[in-house]
């Protein structure tokens, strides 16, 4: 699905959110009608607008270091020692971008999440639920239009302002118990052409989609996950980002 976002077709157009929605529908059979594509700046902006988020950074490796990583090329410097935080927007972005620590110059290796991106996604989901539990309430509804206006230049979406206002009323009764997370069945694959990617198990996905979402398996329009970006397309060379 990440690969679909970075997919470049024959005309040179980048797939983006539209291609991602198409890929999800082809793989799961579930229609995706709306999307919001956030930049890192938008994420930081929203968290700062909502106010600090209480969140605990675990001692991932038992060494008291926590999440520390430096990438001068991207001007990325993550510094989140273990402990309790009143997390601001910049720290929230660090949390979501963190994958592993710096390379140990003596050994040439680095410490990272035990289960790789699966653990990273789980950490992101925990933070999302913390945001929902602490900040999503009836009073937020009044702030939604102004927040949407403020970040409009930092996001890509097919929501109109009127639709945002229309659907925001449902936030009044929303909590993290309404959020259910599922992972597409499959396995990791790594090669020089595609990098590290997750190959979906289409048979198991059909079963999951029927059991969890109630959509019939015959809605799934691809048996080849590598072609999920387009019916006649090929697999993207992009790795997991």
Predicted regions span which residues?
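Non-catalytic, solvent-exposed segments at the cell envelope interface
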Residues: 1-241
